[in-house]
Amino acid sequence: MAKPTRKRRVKKNIESGIAHIHATFNNTIVMITDVHGNAIAWSSAGALGFKGSRKSTPFAAQMASEAAAKSAQEHGLKSVEVTVKGPGSGRESAIRALAAAGLEVTAIRDVTPVPHNGARPPKRRRV
């Protein structure tokens, strides 16, 4: 039986893009796209092997950001605009990690969705 051939990842030569950081209370997802929104690279705290409450730490967000940046730089990415969504603890550390990985951060935008009094929020936790 013939061996299945793996699809080779095509190197995209993209100079600038957008880094979308989705920081929830439980996880941090970093996705780097081109200016049209087509994904170049992504990473998350959970994908790197962090489990449970460790996923929501700033260190996990930093590692996810570094992994996504390293993968995007292989496609020739040099500068990014950053959009941050969500209330998570990994917001600042993810942005710092992108800059430390060698990507030039040109703009930081907060796109956290704020309801105009929409659905009822979940009840308060009593710990």
Curated annotation (Swiss-Prot):
Gene3D superfamilies per record: Ribosomal protein S11
Domain of life: Bacteria
A molecular function (GO) term: structural constituent of ribosome
GO biological process, one term: translation
Keyword Ribonucleoprotein appears in the UniProt entry: yes
UniProt record similarity statement: Belongs to the universal ribosomal protein uS11 family.
PANTHER family per the UniProt record, alphabetical: 40S RIBOSOMAL PROTEIN S14/30S RIBOSOMAL PROTEIN S11
Complex and partners: Part of the 30S ribosomal subunit. Interacts with proteins S7 and S18. Binds to IF-3.
Protein name as annotated: Small ribosomal subunit protein uS11
The organism of origin for this protein: Streptococcus sanguinis (strain SK36)
